[in-house]
């Protein structure tokens, strides 16, 4: 899992969103590509992963944000191809006004213990994950109330109109059993306790240092589950995981370094890539010297050569150049290609130019350069990229001292804002809405504002970008926001990355259109026809 943090016009009165499979059917499996293959039941699938959460409490795992969580945890909705919302535990959604969403639940859904899921479970689950102690509470800040209206209806009322909210139940707010959670307060999700959910596979054991075991859920609302048993083995490094793939010990993996993994995994597996919206970037703390000087930040922007940094990341197969905090593909949900290009062409640009970088530094309070510290962990090619960044900044007199730490330490320091005045990382977005990356990185309400950049103008633009219903006005809001960010440069976006799947040649699996964490992707895995 890369540092993947998740984060539509307001409907007319009583509009029904197109998220039903036809009436309120409760027996049809989730939509999605079927792929090619035999269609025969698979006895056991063995997958690999390099890190597991200490436990599976949704409050401590970004709502179970893991490549395999979608196999056993479900949401109200799911995001399908072309960013279409599709049913999962809710069959449809109605909007009687701009701040009210009514979710009509699927009837007959059972938890693994056989108890029926009702609105009480959904309300409890969502309230649990929007509590102040939750690590995803930021995604529910605009929620006023969540209430039940009968056993199969849940009403969410927002504090104000929010154009991005409609996607939220497809990537946040996994649903679990209320009675189980209440009986295991403080221990739910721990190994030996686990959780009660509704997904097609039942979680039967979990040890974050060894493995996760899943078995087919006989109660699943979607019908017969095609794989009887799934084992996820945890490895200390991607190298050891690749060697396990080569030997046939595992059948599937989601490597962070696809190019290197493919070479080590051998010819018995095939690598595929998929590219959800992402930004790989340098952040600078605008509230602390020396990065509180805008000329320093502009010097950094001019000094970084995206071609070199993509090469350090593994080359063109791993990334494509990008320079804006909101990817163009997300802006295109609000306007035509011509309209989006007009917005992007109007932004301040910082192409690689050492002469301009030196000129900007000369105008700063640090004309002779300075030393800054940063941290990095050994994830993917992050070490190689931060070393390349340091080498390029050294050319203009900025000495970046790099401390390599464990992933656990990096995550702790990231959460506490202790990575240093300058840092490199990447965020992936689960929502196609252009509000998602600003909500991660900008303004007073952001949990992940590494730069501490929160001028009142940005807060206002973020609020209006969500409150405005007309796509053209939202595009104007986000265009102005991008212009402000490009002028002040709290972040320098370098490129967009790719995600990878390595799959044994024994199997077929359709391309991913959304994150594995938010879909029951293994439903579509099949044995390859001979």
Question: Where are these predicted regions, by residue range?
Answer:
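Ligand/substrate-recognition segments at binding pockets and active sites
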Residues: 208, 354, 358-429, 445
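Gly/Pro-rich hinge or "lid" segments in bacterial periplasmic/extracellular proteins
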Residues: 170-224, 229
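Structural transition elements
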Residues: 320-360, 381-382
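Ligand-site clamp/hinge motif
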Residues: 217-263
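N-terminal lobe/hinge region of extracytoplasmic solute-binding protein
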Residues: 48-97, 127, 196
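Detector for C-terminal structural segments
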Residues: 16, 21, 36-37, 207, ...
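Surface-exposed binding/hinge segments that line
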Residues: 94, 102, 138-182, 205
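Alpha-helical secondary-structure segments
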Residues: 118-125, 151-157, 199-200, 227-229, ...
